[in-house]
Amino acid sequence: MLSNTLRSNFLKFYTNRNHTPVASSPVFPYNDPSILFTNAGMNQFKNIFLGKEQTSYTRATTSQKCIRAGGKHNDLENVGHTSRHLTFFEMLGNFSFGDYFKQDAISFAWEVSLSVFNFDPDFIYATVHEKDDEAFALWEKYLPTNRIFRLTDKDNFWSMADTGPCGFCSELLFDRGEKFGKATSPLEDADGERFLEYWNLVFMEFNRTSDGTLLALQKKCVDTGAGLERLVSLLSETDTVFEADVLRHLIAKVENLSEITYSPTESKGSAFRVIADHVRSLSFAITDGLLPGNTERGYVLRKILRRAVNYGKRLGFHRPFLAEIVPSLIETMGEAYPELQAAETQIQEVLTTEEEHFFKTLQRGGNLLHQVLKSSASLSKISGEDAFKLKDTYGLPIDEIALLAKDHNYTVDMDTFRKLEMEAKERSRKNTVKNKNDSDSIFQDVDPTNTSEFVGYDMLSCDTFIEGIVKYNEIASTLEEGEEGAIILRTTPFYAEKGGQVGDSGEIFCESGTFLVSHTTTPKAGLIAHHGKLSQGSLQTTMAVTAQVNQNLRKKIANNHTGCHLLHKALEVSLGEHIRQAGSYVDSQKIRLDFSHNKALSPEELLTIETLVNEKIRENVPVTIREALYSDVMNSSEIKQFFGDKYGDIVRVVSAGFSHELCGGTHARATGDIGYFRITKEHAVSTGIRRIEATTGEDAENIARGQDTDLNEIATIIQSPKDQLLVKLRNVMEEKKDLAKQLANLENQLVQQQVKSLLTSCDKVNETSYLVYHLTEEEGQRIQHYANTLHKEVPAKFISLWVTEKNDRYIVLVRVSDDLVKQGIDAQALLEELLAPYGGRCGGKAVSAQGSSKELPQIEVLNTILRQWISTRLA
């Protein structure tokens, strides 16, 4: 694959020129809620550019995985319809943090263009900012003046935000020839098809103030980005990015599955392009820990998947098919991104599960669309509200809704639709911006020289000094008895909450007073805050104090943290390499571990995992902790690391028997210190994410003892020895099953008899029979049984509506015969319409739906409403 060669040679070029190769960050920034997805190579270096973070290197090079499908940078709707828009792409880049600037950046870019990209220099053009005389002069060393163009802020000025670091930029373009347009220069090429931009060099040299003033930065930086797919297309001389390399390989797989030949210019060509791009985006997102959902990034992923499925229908796919394309992606990109291979099973399972769910939704949406068409007959227009619901809830693309409407000589209220869509986008945008924790905001005003040194790995007590006091609404110098606040120490043995481990508790004291520490946090970089309450006396800044961690709780936390590591490894060994940690929490009482897995764990699997962890505990191997250069361990398949954590140049490698992880937390001295491990709960957190809760040591033993006590009590109640409990319980359950069968038979007979009498009560309108019937509360327990039995007796052209009461609410069930469903009648839509005036809610399918409401009209009124509804809809 040309992309693999280009990527490798680009990184080698800069590595040979003293750039540190930095691995791609995930496709979404864990610690930056200001953007939905990673959309540029500079995202992971943002805090370095802002001066908030230091690194040991001043030069870096990356190939960054990017997604542009939400927020400010959103190419989703363009994908498939243009020659170069993608939701997923790779951005090659080189970066300088106060090292070299324009001269070397331009020199490097020219050399790479010729020696790595192998471009003909006679076809290269450059643009610079109209005020950037320095860049213009530098390009004159390589290009004739008539191939260097000065442009305005709109095209050649870059800024991270309204204020802060910014600067001029310079773009490199390649002339693809007259085949792509008659323009003779980039200035005439409005669409950018002939003179294709392939690299952008950003020179961060200013700091923009709130009044717009540009001040010179003390540390000037360089940030460049070149789209890999665009480079591959240029070198392959293809019309679009889809006709070359990885994307063409994926399109070939779609050709094979659909048995349709791809033609870029035919109408179905867009479907091939959409599917190829979207499968790649989804696969990388799932690999990095994202899952389709209903909010924020998950919502965007679900939109991408549903868009791929809808375009798949144009190629004849009416079943889940996306997972079948994944092996072709791994075949082409698995070597560069081995994490794709490890996550293959999970990617396929997530895609298939989502597709199955969506196909069911589409069936309901299609039925609903036909119903909407019927209900809008008098206006010959689909309302914007209905169109938005069909798109947002049921995933029907607006162009498909419009086409179906046109087939029936209907129009769509697009103005209202677009208004509702904009409102939904605004809600989504607001949801992505996390509000700063009010209780932490005051810490931003703490003197930046008041930093804390953590010494708690080696000691649980130390003599130190109070550097600062915070009372949550103000910076203070004293704390009096009974007051709550936070104390900042010069050195501290207290571990601050991070990496899923709870912060330490304990005491800070001297002769003047005692402060009880309830928890410890890091409200901003370099600052450790000890939160709590002054129990007696008074304390003030500069005082000499003793900081004492609660030793018993620290030991329990450390044991649980090591237990969490063992659990994580046991999950991987027992369930497969697709297991990825999705979150964790450890305190003195429990372990909570979230992990990627698509189904509930069986009792046998849980027992296997628990047994394996306890085996490792009994081995009593030392827990070793060593420091290492992150660059030395970042690509190790043996050492677990998590994208949610920000790693520095030096990292801690924690090894506990078969488990090896990068971790900054506190741990047991040996696995035997944990004592005993017990799983207490396993359940789903969200689609594709499971959670195990567990505990260790005395807490685990207490659970075991409590369960043993319960068994003794059960044995006494059912009058059986403990060793015969299982046999006795099975006998009891068999007896219960027999009794249940007898009861069911009696109930069935009762229902059959009552249904026969109801047949004479059915009414008829427009050749459709219907029944509205009120069941007693006792009969209402079998409401579904009544409906199913009656519809067996009247299998066609029949609608039944049943009402009963439960817990001071009306329970309503609507059942529709299959032939009416095929005509577009939807039980849920009918029930929604019926309950809406009374504030009721419902759920279900086209054939049957059930809901409830606090209010409901008399049964006679319901009969009239249903009769009128049938008269209108089935005229």
Curated annotation (Swiss-Prot):
Coiled coil: none
UniProt cofactor(s): Zn(2+)
GO CC terms of this entry: cytosol
Highest taxon in the source lineage: Bacteria
GO terms, biological process: alanyl-tRNA aminoacylation
Region of interest: Disordered: 426-445
SUPFAM superfamilies: Class II aaRS and biotin synthetases (SSF55681), Putative anticodon-binding domain of alanyl-tRNA synthetase (AlaRS) (SSF101353), ThrRS/AlaRS common domain (SSF55186), Translation proteins (SSF50447)
Stored InterPro entries: aa-tRNA-synth_II/BPL/LPL, Ala-tRNA-lgiase_IIc, Ala-tRNA-ligase_IIc_anticod-bd, Ala-tRNA-synth_IIc_core, Ala-tRNA-synth_IIc_N, Ala-tRNA_ligase, Ala_tRNA_ligase_euk/bac, DHHA1_dom
Catalytic activity line of the entry: tRNA(Ala) + L-alanine + ATP = L-alanyl-tRNA(Ala) + AMP + diphosphate
Enzyme Commission no: 6.1.1.7
Residue sites binding Zn(2+) per the record: H561, H565, C663, H667
Cellular compartment(s): Cytoplasm
CC cofactor note: Binds 1 zinc ion per subunit.
Keywords, sorted A to Z: Aminoacyl-tRNA synthetase, ATP-binding, Cytoplasm, Ligase, Metal-binding, Nucleotide-binding, Protein biosynthesis, RNA-binding, tRNA-binding, Zinc
GO molecular function list: alanine-tRNA ligase activity; aminoacyl-tRNA deacylase activity; ATP binding; tRNA binding; zinc ion binding
Primary location group: cytoplasm
Record's comment describing the protein's domains: Consists of three domains; the N-terminal catalytic domain, the editing domain and the C-terminal C-Ala domain. The editing domain removes incorrectly charged amino acids, while the C-Ala domain, along with tRNA(Ala), serves as a bridge to cooperatively bring together the editing and aminoacylation centers thus stimulating deacylation of misacylated tRNAs.
Similarity field: Belongs to the class-II aminoacyl-tRNA synthetase family.
Protein's recorded name: Alanine--tRNA ligase
Gene symbol of the encoding locus: alaS
